[in-house]
Amino acid sequence: VTSTSQGPESGARAAHPDHLGHVIFITAAAAMGGFLFGYDSSVINGAVEAIRHRYDIGSGTLAQVIAIALIGCAIGAATAGRIADRIGRIRCMQIAAVLFTISAVGSALPFALWDLAMWRIIGGFAIGMASVIGPAYIAEVSPPAYRGRLGSFQQAAIVIGIAVSQLVNYGILQIADGDQRGKIAGLEAWQWMLGVMVVPAVLYGLLSFAIPESPRFLLSIGKRERARKILEEVEGKNVDLDARVEEIETAMRREHKSSFRDLLGSRFGFLPIVWVGIGLSVFQQLVGINVAFYYSATLWQSVGIDPTDSFFYSFTTSIINIIGTVIAMVLVDRVGRRPLALAGSCGMAVALAFEAWAFSADLVDGKLPTTQGTVALIAAHVFVLFFALSWGVIVWVFLGEMFPNRIRAAALGVAASAQWIANWAITASFPSLADWNLSGTYIIYACFATLSIPFVIKFVKETKGKALEEMG
């Protein structure tokens, strides 16, 4: 997805007040892809144990069924930019909405384990598309003065999607009397959990018809008047629209369609800035954040918490995730991206260390001792809070901003794919690692959180307040 932005001379660093509400609506509609991203990613949390028992599978096979969606995510993220540059951002969103719908229906009504895995791959492809198209589209329609905050809508939508999925799972479990395989209208509870995603998927598709195409894409295919009209909608009549159109066209003439070859450097394969993007993406996942959203119900049950309470704690964790994201949205354009990243890394490292200590205790009657159990619950929530107010938001903002125009599309796709591959590695390995040593697993995650601190200090540059043309 190739995007450009106005330079400082354009006078468009802030939207006209009359148009900011319209820009917010457009951003929120596009961020519905993020909502589905969060919902589809974490809804499986409520079905893990039911799938294990329904198909009588061990931890290794179970992990592959859960993690296989991430293969689709990586493919979707790698190809979405090229698809969007060819057919447009809106059409890309509509394709993703259809795939989300198909995945929801198929996952709720699987014939066997193999087709459940297939439906999850399809849903993963849609998630991967949404992970790239959402931030890029939002960056293209957002005035620079608001770009950080509007860019945060994507992560806000993701965490709201996570929270809603956990709330829906908890509600369905209550209806099924606490049994994930309890019958509701002929289907097991876990099938309803996966099938409910049809509702937001259809809403996403409908909203995509209510928002305009990116003016930058329209200019790239020669639709100058349509692009001019949309720029007027999002930036106001007081802006010199002819100058803005000329400015974008000039920037587009200076750049070319990015390809994988453009990312190659003389040392270590990729250009240094691409490695920084990959590093940000990978560190975001290697701290183990998605263990909290894919396996938390199973994790709490493994240390003696009953199923209903484990679902409730999964929901409270997702609420903390929302609170942290709101904090990040408020601070990202005030204190900058790097300070948030460093604060988050420090907080996560400490919280993960406490979790590792708590899980090192021997179980008493199948439960953690009271002190360790309390510490584990508090530390898990603190970990999610520090992730949400930092890496959960700033990585997406960085990836939308940090690359030069000439390589942005390809670099964003590679970085997003790296994120999904790292996510897959953590998701696929956790059940086996937990069987090996739960405390040791959290020590590994704490080490990655600690290593992210020198990485940010040495390699990551601040992007706060810069126009996209200044990057790289």
Give the positions of each predicted feature:
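Short, well-structured alpha-helical segments
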Residues: 238-250
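Short helix/loop segments within enzyme catalytic domains
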Residues: 234-236
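Alpha-helical transmembrane bundle of multi-pass membrane proteins
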Residues: 1-226, 230-232, 252-472
